[in-house]
Amino acid sequence: MKAAVINDPVDGFVTVKDVQLRDLKPDEALVDVEYCGLCHTDLHVAAGDFGEKPGTIIGHEGVGRVSKVAPGVTSLKVGDRVSIAWFFKGCGHCEYCLTGRETFCREVINAGYTADGAMAQQCIVPADYAVKVPEGLDPVEATSLTCAGVTMYKALKVAGIKPGQWVSIVGAGGLGNLGIQFAHNVFGAHVVAVDGNEDKLQAAKENGAEVLINRHDGDVDKQIQEKVGGVHAAVVTAVNASAFDQAVDSLRPDGKLVAVALPQGDMQLNIAKTVLDGIIVAGSLVGTRQDLAECFQFGAEGKVKPIVKTRKLDEINDMIQELKDNKVVGRNVVDFVHE
């Protein structure tokens, strides 16, 4: 099968090559991948930012049909459409797995990082961890919900945002665009979109953002304070440390910063402001299987609609460069159906 494999030596890019899959082990299923999106986390993995993984197949925004199951598998059957997500498998018995916080499992396995991922014609998955995709949901759109969508859905849950409150989505790309839709259409919030790209801001407006702020037009935090009196929550998807500092200063008292992006570096936090204004800072990491099932259902109901563009597998390094250059609106998705 054809797959996108991290280069050796690691250099931030991949090579499309033929790979032979191993046999299925107990509790596993084989998925014929239909589509797989390219996520910014794939860039981190390909560059070795989390530790070098040469030879690993990238991809954790995969959707496909089950073509084979190992003996004893009861959670899936041949023909089921399933997702291949970043949260690939947990231990199943730690305090996090047992209390609905499985993404924090210390023995977690991640698709496209510590296990071969979905940027390939086929992928082996742990059957009990492959969340089914509703038949009413476009599989191309489902790829974005598998990672970007559920990440933002969970982040807004963590933010505790309520109907009528203001939330800023900092970074209006693939993650941010879906976050805007979830905030507006599912949580009933008012949305401030922050980005430095006018095309992305226009897309944000079309998807429900009421206030648009171009970060090149001056201090983001001051603009937000002037326009809406500060936000109740800020969800940061922008991959630069300064965005986090600005987001904290854009909060109103008792506000909450939810960190989603993973830039290199540290975040500056004024202790006095944090205490006196009751500021809360929280990290949010993708979502659980239940979060993803809920996310898919909102997609099937038409409450969120990812911006997607299908590409060929041979274009994967061009896709990586475009994402590095901040030129992607929505998500680029590799089409394996017509490969």
Regions found by a protein language model. Give the residues of each.
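Mid-domain Rossmann-like dinucleotide-binding core that forms the NAD(H)/NADP(H) cofactor-binding site
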Residues: 82, 128, 135-223
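Rossmann-fold dehydrogenase core element
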Residues: 256-258, 268-309
